Amino acid sequence: MTLPFGASEIWYAFAFASPSRPRIELYFGSPDADRNESAFKVFEMRRQALEAGFGEPLDFQPLEGKKASRIVAWGPTTHTIMDPAQHPQVAGWFIETMARFRQVTQAFKSATAHQPTAAPLASEGI
C-alpha cells in the first residue's frame, strides 16, 4: 500500500520484505535516475536529524544499478503476516511507525525542491 509524500515521484509504502519482516519506506521512484538520486541525497545529507527525529536508525538504500532509491524503517522480526493472531500487532506497528516516519520526513519536504548540496534549512526544525 502506498501513500503520497507530496511530490509525485516520491511516496510512502507499507511492505513486507518477507512474511516476518515488515517495513515502511520512503520510495524515490521517478523514471529519471538523476532526479531520484538528487532527492535521495537531500535526505541522506540530513540523516542524523532524520534518525534523531524518528527515534531509531533508518536504512538508506540507494539501490545501486537501479533508478530508484528508498529509506526504510524496519519492523520487528517477531511480527508475521502469516499468523492472523498477530495482524493487530502488525497493523499497530505500521500505523504508529508511519505516523512518526511521515512526521519527520515531511519536515524535509521543501528541501527536495532545493539543490541537494544546500545546507539544512533552519525552518526544517529537526
Describe each PLM feature range.
Residues 52-70, 107-126:
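Short glycine-rich, low-complexity/disordered patches
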Residues 1-78:
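Polyanion-binding interface signature
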